[in-house]
């Protein structure tokens, strides 16, 4: 009879159970087997009486279509995430709904519950509640009358789930934004906050809003973690993805090059602020545990001049305000203490226009906020909280300092480099100008030595650049500007006199220490102002590089600097050869020819003589009068430094340097290296100088 009893294929499950069951579960097993036998009897295709030609009408049923078990195109049932206990014991396909259709058909709806699987070895220490499946959209909460009653109570957990999961019908609502602000969130931010909004997370704690709060804090939501979820996690609540206030920090204002880096930095700052591990406090304190959950609205609590006593009482100040000075009532964060250090970690959780207290307290921070950096998304922020821009920035000391002088990299955006660079840099013109300058300044013998050094690397330059098209050259210039962007930040915090130049020798960047050492102002070095230097280092004794041959004894009439040879009067960056004396220039280009296409990580350490910046007016003054003038300046600044160091209004950059120079030269020890681009071509030269005392 084995050929006559065929079980319908869709009712057979593919996998076998791996569970071990106790004796008290055998009753359900017997009930399941009896139902299976009844189902098999009803699904017989051909009864015994049909073989003899007698058709039995009582057993004649509608024949179900047969499907070949080996046919890959046969219809299959969708497997459930986890089978119920009865279907698991009977090895039949179950569904996601509870109770499942098979248990309803067999009358086992009350006993239909998820089966227990055998744990893997690495999950032996995990609690059973953490291994439960994520409930699908077809999950039926109203199993029976008693289970529906248990699910309707928010404080009583469902059977078998413990205190780990929050019920979908009791998901909290976060009153972060007012009624008039709904739907005004930018689309990019909505996409980032879309996850976890339609379905509760399995690790989401239940947030309850405190009912008692001061009268001045009615517009601020105060979410607190419930005791059940707090005890389930062992002391601290996890991050709730369904809470939009948890991720309410401006990613664009953090000035990261990518979204994931800004999100990671914001989460680390959120954890460092202690908001995720602060235990629940009494609701009478009136302050939220998470500063990121504050709902800033256009009420009187955050105006420019709020009454302090109406906002915060003395016993309701949060923990983050301990390190700040208590203001006198003018504003929330006082600026009487200039030594409270860097902004706290909670400052990153606010929007881009809400500056940290230490930044707002400084007089030079009004024109250097986060609004100065170009962003692709405009986030709406309360206009009353944005500080007003100063109109007299040039009168104070903040007008002399650039945006990078106070905030450094925070208000700079490297993405502007890729938007502004559209043309390749003309290195051919730079080399032609360098050749013209060398021929007009140096003697023929020195010019020949420099020309030999440049001629030795000329074929390598030609072979590396002959296959590059216009797009490659533009990309090369973008790489140069992006690398220079990083070096400018390094030079801002480096106290060593440093200069960065292109492979043609044109100055691209210099820090203020180099300006103090040589007297060359940054505007002159970069070609923004005319070069009036008359110091070429030729006033001293003859150098060792000069030749005594008679053919080169005829002097050459040449201009003092390159600006005199430019007929159009157009300024250009200063060459490195204009900053060094004759012997130093020759030595530099000999080392450059050896290092340009040699060791990619090599460096040169030697001694050079830098030329001080001197104009015709400086050389016409007598040394005696200049020396007496400097004595007066030293006496004025010395009194300020000794008594009131913080009240110095002006510092003479020449003090102390005059004793180091001799004949307009400063003997320095230099260490420099070459940075190459992606095409393995020398891109820029980084040089450090230290004066030899």
UniProtKB/Swiss-Prot annotation:
CDD domains: GAL4. Residues 21-49, 65-74 have a biased composition (Basic and acidic residues). Residues 84-112 bind DNA. GO terms for cellular component: nucleus. InterPro entries: ERT1_acuK_gluconeogen_tf, PAS_13, Zn2-C6_fun-type_DNA-bd_sf, Zn2Cys6_DnaBD. It is found in: Nucleus. It comes from the Eukaryota. Keywords: Activator, DNA-binding, Gluconeogenesis, Metal-binding, Nucleus, Transcription, Transcription regulation, Zinc. Residues 356-367, 394-408 have a biased composition (Low complexity). GO terms for molecular function: DNA-binding transcription factor activity, RNA polymerase II-specific; RNA polymerase II transcription regulatory region sequence-specific DNA binding; zinc ion binding. Belongs to the ERT1/acuK family. Transcription factor which regulates nonfermentable carbon utilization. Activator of gluconeogenetic genes. This is Transcription activator of gluconeogenesis BC1G_14637. It comes from Botryotinia fuckeliana (strain B05.10).
């Amino acid at each position: 009879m084995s050929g006559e009893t065929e079980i319908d294929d869709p009712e057979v499950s593919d996998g076998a159970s791996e569970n071990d069951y106790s004796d008290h579960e055998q009753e359900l097993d017997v009930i399941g087997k009896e139902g299976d036998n009844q189902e098999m009897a009803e699904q017989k295709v051909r009864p015994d009486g049909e073989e003899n030609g007698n058709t039995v009408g009582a057993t004649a049923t509608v024949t179900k279509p047969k499907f070949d078990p080996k046919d890959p195109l046969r219809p299959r049932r969708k497997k459930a995430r986890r089978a119920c206990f009865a279907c698991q014991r009977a090895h039949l396909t179950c569904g996601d709904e509870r109770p499942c259709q098979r248990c309803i058909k067999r009358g086992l709806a009350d006993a239909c519950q998820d089966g227990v699987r055998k744990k893997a070895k690495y999950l032996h220490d995990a609690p059973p509640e953490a291994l439960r499946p994520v409930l699908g959209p077809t999950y039926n909460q109203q199993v029976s009358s008693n289970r529906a009653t248990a699910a309707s109570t928010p404080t009583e957990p469902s059977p078998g789930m413990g205190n780990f999961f929050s019920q979908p019908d009791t998901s909290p609502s976060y009153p972060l934004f007012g009624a008039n602000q709904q739907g005004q969130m930018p689309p990019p931010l909505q996409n980032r906050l879309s996850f976890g909004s339609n379905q509760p997370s399995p690790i989401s704690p239940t947030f309850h809003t405190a009912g008692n709060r001061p009268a001045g804090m009615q517009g601020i939501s105060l979410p607190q973690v419930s005791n059940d979820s707090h005890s389930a996690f062992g002391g601290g609540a996890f991050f709730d993805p369904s809470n939009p206030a948890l991720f309410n920090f401006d990613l664009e204002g953090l000035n990261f090059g990518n979204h994931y880096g800004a999100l990671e930095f914001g989460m680390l700052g959120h954890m460092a602020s202690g908001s995720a591990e602060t235990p629940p406090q009494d609701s009478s304190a009136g302050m939220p545990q998470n500063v990121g959950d504050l709902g800033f609205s256009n009420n009187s609590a955050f105006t420019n001049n709020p009454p302090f006593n109406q906002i915060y009482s003395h016993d309701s100040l949060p923990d983050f305000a301990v390190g700040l000075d208590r203001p006198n009532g003018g504003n929330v964060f006082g600026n009487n203490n200039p030594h409270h250090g860097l902004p706290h970690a909670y400052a990153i959780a606010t929007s881009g226009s809400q500056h940290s207290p230490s930044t707002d307290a400084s007089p030079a921070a009004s024109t250097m906020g986060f609004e100065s950096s170009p962003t692709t998304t405009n986030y709406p922020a309360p206009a009353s909280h944005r500080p007003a821009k100063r109109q007299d920035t040039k009168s104070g000391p903040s007008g002399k300092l650039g945006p990078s002088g106070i905030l450094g990299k925070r208000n700079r955006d490297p993405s502007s480099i890729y938007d502004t660079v559209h043309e390749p840099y003309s290195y051919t013109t730079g080399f032609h100008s360098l050749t013209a300058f060398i021929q007009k300044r140096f003697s023929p013998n020195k010019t020949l030595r420099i020309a030999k050094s440049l001629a030795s690397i000329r074929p390598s330059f030609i072979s590396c650049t002959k296959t590059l098209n216009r797009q490659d050259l533009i990309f090369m210039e973008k790489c140069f500007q992006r690398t220079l962007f990083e070096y400018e930040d390094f030079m801002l915090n480096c106290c060593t006199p440093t200069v960065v130049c292109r492979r043609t020798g044109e100055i691209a960047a210099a820090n203020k220490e180099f300006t103090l050492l040589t007297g060359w102002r940054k505007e002159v070095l970069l070609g923004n102002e005319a070069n009036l230097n008359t110091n070429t280092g030729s006033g001293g004794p003859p150098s060792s590089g000069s030749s005594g041959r008679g053919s080169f004894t005829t002097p050459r009439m040449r201009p003092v600097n390159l600006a005199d040879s430019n007929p159009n009067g157009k300024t250009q960056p200063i060459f490195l050869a204009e900053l060094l004396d004759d012997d130093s220039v020759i030595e530099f280009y000999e080392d450059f020819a050896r290092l340009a296409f040699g060791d990619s990580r090599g460096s040169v350490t030697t001694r050079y003589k830098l030329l001080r910046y001197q104009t015709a007016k400086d050389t016409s003054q007598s040394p005696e009068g200049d020396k007496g003038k400097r004595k007066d300046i030293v006496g004025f600044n010395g009194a300020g430094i000794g008594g009131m160091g913080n009240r110095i209004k002006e510092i003479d950059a020449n003090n102390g340097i005059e004793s180091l120079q001799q004949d307009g030269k400063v003997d320095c020890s230099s260490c420099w290296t070459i940075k190459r681009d992606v095409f393995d071509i020398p891109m820029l030269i980084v040089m450090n100088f230290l004066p030899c005392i």
